[in-house]
């Protein structure tokens, strides 16, 4: 089926979203045009406002509309802990754990094959933040449990070690409520390597 230039442009615009292929983009575009024009207008308005009004926090680099995000402007948070994550969505995930320290958001993970070195993901800015705020006593490396995430955590841990700072890594393993026969071998191996004695 051949689409008009404006419909084709809308379909192509939807395809920039992660996980949205040609068919899904077509369905989205046609749904808005055929059945929900007011929803499409609200989407366009909200998208325009967000693109113009949302930037990065001056300290942690998460997404925010202010100079400082709510976590960085909260004076009650623990200034001795810094949690390093790969992206803004990770901040929201860690917040659900009850963590009350500070954050630093990288722009992804090290991936030399994709041309992403330390500068591209913000490691120099991380080290500058740590140098400027001398209250940090522990840096929690909460990068993803992928090969790239592990490499990123190891690289940062080495830099921190050279500065005499404590680096810790979040534990990986069997999810709460998970069944062992459904867990992949790599995850189970991490669980065994990170086992702890039972406190009685």
UniProtKB/Swiss-Prot annotation:
**Which residues belong to any copy of the Toprim domain?**
80-175
**InterPro entries the record matches:** DNA_Rcmb_RecR, Rcmb_RecR, Rcmb_RecR_Znf, TOPRIM_dom, TOPRIM_RecR
Q: Which residues form a coiled coil?
A: none
- Disulfide pattern: none
The reply to whether DNA damage figures as a keyword in the UniProt entry is: yes
GO biological process terms, semicolon-separated? DNA recombination; DNA repair
Q: Which PROSITE patterns match?
A: RECR, TOPRIM
Pfam short name (any one):
Toprim_4
Q: Which UniProt keywords apply?
A: DNA damage, DNA recombination, DNA repair, Metal-binding, Zinc, Zinc-finger
ZnF C4-type span: 57-72
The record's family statement is:
Belongs to the RecR family.
Q: What does this protein do?
A: May play a role in DNA repair. It seems to be involved in an RecBC-independent recombinational process of DNA repair. It may act with RecF and RecO.
This chain belongs to the protein called Recombination protein RecR
Organism of derivation: Pseudomonas syringae pv. tomato (strain ATCC BAA-871 / DC3000)
